[in-house]
């Protein structure tokens, strides 16, 4: 839809350009518009088709392929609820092999970090009217679940050194959120270099993150700036800590994923719907952000297809599933 809106806007601008050309007759305008539309249609048709195979960016047997979006969806009364950012989401998906988790952190009224996307489960609160920390901790998300707070996040980090946490935020100054995380890490004397995977939205943010802390890896995301392939490659070349690129489905035709793969960068696509996950793999991605697909489910149902889309597939053995008994989980829905 975003792609179609983009081309609609471009066509509107093109028509405006033609109206200002006094020397061009009405019939001439129609001919040029028809030709431009035909070229657009042909280019869009071809750009939508995925390649037969893509360069293997260098996935390994121990790699993770799923990021639990907002901590992962949970079921309540037979309905799957997303954007929970809950502790129980971490527990459930960890138990099913997932080792990469994305949480949305914002500041409470007192300046502490709490997890929420857009206050979906906290009536009366917003970015302009932050929730008090005590109110957040005393509120059960969807009436059942514990929200992730800054203190709980550090508990989870210390107890699960095999996990990576990707921190997104709707705060206008994203760097402030990471400054708070680094401040907490120093106070608690916790090494977050491997546990926190910065979710970088721009070149400016990348510079700030690199000055702030020596993170081992960084994930670049294209969902705010909509960079071109050339711009993305320039940013990637400027920082060897960038190991991942996060995109939305619109980027399947906006950027050349194969060129990103050639740099050894793994592309993770944001695929909310379970039945759409394979589309990302068809376009050369080697990871997904998902509300409800676990790591073990991915490896069971989608891994072989992903491998079939990558060159030198014989060098990529099927990874073993994570053991489900790694953590005990008690959930009541």
Protein language model features and the residues they cover:
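Phosphate-group recognition and catalysis centered on beta-loop-alpha active-site segments
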Residues: 3-6, 10-333
């Amino acid at each position: 839809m975003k792609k179609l809106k983009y081309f609609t806007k471009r066509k509107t601008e093109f028509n405006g350009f033609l109206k200002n050309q006094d020397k061009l007759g009405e019939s001439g305008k129609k001919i040029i518009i028809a030709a431009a539309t035909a070229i657009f249609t042909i280019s869009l048709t071809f750009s939508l088709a995925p390649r037969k195979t893509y360069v293997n960016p260098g996935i390994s047997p121990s790699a993770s392929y799923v990021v639990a979006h907002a901590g992962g969806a949970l079921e309540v009364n037979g309905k799957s609820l997303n954007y929970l950012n809950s502790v129980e989401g971490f527990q459930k998906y960890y138990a099913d092999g997932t080792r990469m988790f994305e949480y949305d952190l914002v500041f409470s009224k007192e300046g502490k970090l709490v997890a929420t996307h857009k206050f979906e489960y906290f009536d009366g609160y917003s970015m302009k009217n932050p929730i008090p920390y005590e109110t957040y901790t005393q509120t059960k998300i969807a009436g059942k679940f514990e929200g992730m707070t800054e203190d709980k996040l550090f508990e989870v980090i210390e107890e699960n050194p095999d996990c990576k946490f990707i921190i997104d935020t709707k705060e206008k100054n994203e760097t402030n959120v990471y400054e708070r995380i680094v401040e907490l890490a120093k106070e608690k004397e916790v090494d977050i270099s491997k546990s926190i995977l910065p979710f970088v939205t721009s070149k400016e943010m990348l510079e700030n993150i690199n000055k702030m802390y020596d993170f081992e890896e960084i994930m670049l995301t294209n969902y705010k700036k909509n960079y071109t392939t050339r711009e993305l490659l320039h940013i990637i070349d400027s920082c060897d800590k960038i190991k991942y690129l996060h995109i939305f489905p619109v980027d399947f035709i906006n950027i050349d994923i194969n060129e990103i793969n050639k740099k050894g960068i793994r592309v993770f696509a944001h695929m909310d719907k379970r039945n759409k996950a394979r589309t990302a793999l068809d376009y050369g991605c080697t990871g997904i952000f998902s509300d409800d697909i676990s790591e073990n489910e991915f490896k069971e149902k989608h891994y072989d297809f992903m491998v079939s889309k990558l060159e030198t597939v014989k060098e990529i053995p099927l990874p073993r599933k994570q053991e489900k008994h790694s953590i005990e989980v008690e959930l009541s829905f």
